[in-house]
From Swiss-Prot:
It is an enzyme of class 6 (ligase). The gene is MSR1. Belongs to the class-I aminoacyl-tRNA synthetase family. Its main location: mitochondrion. This is Arginine--tRNA ligase, mitochondrial. GO terms for biological process: arginyl-tRNA aminoacylation; mitochondrial arginyl-tRNA aminoacylation; mitochondrial translation. One of its GO terms (cellular component) is mitochondrial matrix. Keywords: Aminoacyl-tRNA synthetase, ATP-binding, Ligase, Mitochondrion, Nucleotide-binding, Protein biosynthesis, Transit peptide. It catalyses: tRNA(Arg) + L-arginine + ATP = L-arginyl-tRNA(Arg) + AMP + diphosphate. It comes from the Eukaryota. It comes from Saccharomyces cerevisiae (strain ATCC 204508 / S288c). InterPro entries: aa-tRNA-synth_I_CS, Arg-tRNA-ligase, Arg-tRNA-synth_N, Arg-tRNA-synth_N_sf, ArgRS_core, DALR_anticod-bd, Rossmann-like_a/b/a_fold, tRNAsynth_Ia_anticodon-bd. Disulfide bonds: none annotated. Its EC number is 6.1.1.19.
Length: 643
């Protein structure tokens, strides 16, 4: 209605972990220089060199140029099995699974998936026949399953240099035909607390946006603010009574909330005294009516509250490493779009008039969806009608291939109603909408038990992290900006506590557990990353080029080999997270890498070793740090170098 806020000045926002690349189409392009470098590193182990064109199944969307080691293993397995059984390549490729445990191999093939008779006997026979084919290092039969292990020499030579060359691009892929996705997330209500549900929506939505980009999509991050409705009438009246310009400029969200609380208390007193139709209520209705009618003064007041709030939100979001391309809101949905929605309701015979209101009866398609009012008897539209209008506008203006709504599971019924209505309006693109839900945070409050504002939570996490850091005077003296680092550690603690389990699960917000440097926490991830950065700094005599071209022939320590196997899994982990839309998939993987790094770090040293031993070891540690950096950035964390 009054113009969507498009953020052209990206410097206002926190730097996106991928922002060193072009906004659209930054994904790995594998240019000629990279391809040549990689091919020089490839070793000839008697396997056919495959191109990405060979992958004609669910793995077709691979980057041009070299493919990841586990993809080569997939191809070698499918070729070998096809040669001995005649089974179609695509059936084998789609049946192969990643493993959750290293002792189960690098890839797993459940033989029942490819419909062979007597899968146990066949597994035993094939394990013998396949043991020396291509990059397959070992094959084990376990009941009806075949476990495949990469050839150790190929594993190390193809994985470690690959990571060091690709750096931040490792694990990502470039789609041949880039699709567009709109991710709507966060969506706080102006003048109301930024509560725990908004926090979850914000960090999960930020992760999903990063994940879609990593998988080759063009992403539009949208914040759909609660910036319209009767509360703005109350807010305007309240600000006349209790507003303070200086406080508004300094703390807009907090001050508007305080004003809103006070005016609601006054309103409650009026209602008790039987004056609800005049006084505050009447003034609020009058202001909002003027706002809807486009009154210049009302719009000026509303726009000021909204603009100051957005400016404050941007500052707060930057601490979470979150940015938005569009700040939209309920106010942005045009009357034309809502009228178009109502016209389609009537045209498709979806609405019935009940007591003057327009109602859609969804029980004819699903009993649980019930009836939905789309227009009140006085002619005003409801939230759902605005959402329908907004979806229509977004399809017209943004031309998305998919739109994702990151909204609490408390809204599951509402989102099902919304999607069903769009489907019955015969919008073909209704199938491209997805609701990503999540559970509730229990026990989330400040230590004083006050109303929760996001800034307060972030401040408390930072202060607690800083207090822990100050316990080690020697280490904190080496940190350039302890306050900033503490803020990053505090944010990491909040994000990882949230993302450790499946997003649909409720969880208990626990300050002490969240900020612990022991166990699987955000600070532990940061500690591992900074530890590896320290190793790189103390080994700076060895250049990146030396690490890329290291001789790995003598790298046989089992712990380091297991670490490289984990690093080789990262592209598959990204794919699995993309399929499930679960941040916990990435978090679980990160802790596996950290635990393996820790077991290696204690026993397998770089310092004091001759170059032919130190360089390949350092290459593995440096590749590990890069993968940690990539995965942490994907989750929305900013990895620290010192802490």
């Amino acid at each position: 209605m009054f113009g969507i806020v498009y953020l052209k000045n990206r410097s206002l926002l926190c730097k996106n972990p991928f922002s060193s690349y072009p906004r659209y189409g930054f994904m790995p392009s594998f240019d000629t220089q990279f391809s040549n470098q990689f091919r020089k590193l490839e070793i000839n182990i008697g396997r056919k060199r495959y191109s990405s064109k060979t992958l004609n199944t669910k793995y077709t969307d691979q980057p041009e140029g070299p493919i990841y080691p586990l993809d080569v293993l997939r191809l070698d397995i499918s070729k070998a099995l096809h040669d001995i059984s005649g089974i179609d390549h695509s059936l084998i490729l789609n049946a192969l699974e990643s493993t959750n445990s290293m002792d189960r191999g690098d890839l797993l093939l459940p033989l029942p998936k490819i419909k062979v008779a007597d899968p146990v006997a066949v597994a035993n026979r094939w394990a013998i026949e396949l043991s020396t084919h291509g990059c397959i290092g070992k094959v084990c039969a376990k009941g009806p399953f075949l476990q495949f292990f990469l050839d150790q020499r190929y594993l190390i030579q193809s994985t470690v240099p690959n990571i060091l060359l690709q750096k931040g691009k490792y694990g990502q892929k470039k789609s041949r035909h880039q699709k567009k996705v709109v991710v709507e997330f966060s969506s706080p209500n102006i003048a109301k607390p930024f509560h725990a549900g908004h926090l979850r929506s914000t960090i999960i939505g930020g992760f999903l946006s990063n994940l879609y980009e990593a998988m080759g999509w063009s992403v539009t991050r949208m914040n759909y603010l609660g910036d319209w409705g009767r509360q703005f009438g109350l807010l305007a009246v309240g600000f006349k009574r209790y507003g303070d310009e200086k406080t508004l400029q300094k703390q807009p969200i907090q001050h508007l909330f305080d004003v809103y609380v006070k005016i609601n208390m006054d309103l409650a007193k009026e209602e008790i005294n039987g004056n609800s139709k005049c006084g505050i209520s009447g003034e609020a209705r009058s202001f909002f009516k003027n706002l809807e009618n486009g009154d210049e003064n009302a719009i000026k007041i509303w726009n000021r509250f909204r603009s100051l709030s957005i400016h404050h939100y941007i500052q707060t979001y930057s601490r979470l490493n979150i940015n938005f391309d569009i700040f939209s809101g309920e106010s942005q949905v045009s009357k034309e779009s809502m009228n178009e929605a109502l016209d389609i309701f009537r045209k498709n015979n979806l609405v019935k008039e009940i007591d003057g209101a327009l109602v859609i009866d969804l029980t004819q398609w699903s009993k649980r969806l019930g009836r939905v009012v789309v227009q009140k008897s006085d002619g005003t539209t409801l939230y759902l009608t605005r959402d329908v209008g907004a979806a229509i506008e977004r399809k017209k203006n943004l031309h998305f291939d998919k739109m994702v709504y990151v909204i609490s599971s408390q809204q599951d019924l509402y989102m099902s109603q919304f999607f069903m209505i769009l489907k019955k309006m015969n919008f073909e693109w209704a199938k491209d909408l997805q609701h990503i839900n999540f559970g509730m945070v229990q026990g989330m409050s400040t230590r004083k038990g006050n109303v929760v504002f996001l800034d307060t939570i972030l401040d408390e996490a930072r202060d607690k992290a800083l207090q822990i850091m100050e316990n080690n005077k020697m280490k904190i003296s080496q940190v350039d900006n302890p306050q900033r680092v503490a803020d990053l550690i505090g944010v990491s603690a909040i994000i990882i506590q949230d993302m450790k389990s499946k997003r649909i699960n409720n969880y208990e917000f626990n300050w002490n557990r969240m900020l612990s440097f022991e166990g699987d926490t955000g600070p532990y991830l940061q500690y591992t990353h900074s530890r590896l950065r320290s190793l790189e700094r103390t080994s700076s005599d060895f250049t990146t080029d030396m690490l890329i071209h290291a001789d790995f022939s003598n790298l046989n320590e089992p712990q380091l080999v297991e670490l490289v196997r984990l690093l080789a899994q990262y592209p598959d982990v990204l794919r699995r997270a993309f399929e499930t839309q679960e941040p916990a998939t990435i978090v679980t993987y990160l802790f596996k890498v950290c635990h393996q790094v820790s077991s290696c770090y204690k026993k397998i040293w770089v310092s004091g070793k001759p170059a032919d031993i130190a360089i390949p070891r350092l290459a593995v540690y440096s590749a590990s740090r890069q993968v940690l950096h990539n995965a942490m950035s994907l989750l929305g964390l900013v990895p620290v170098d010192r802490m």
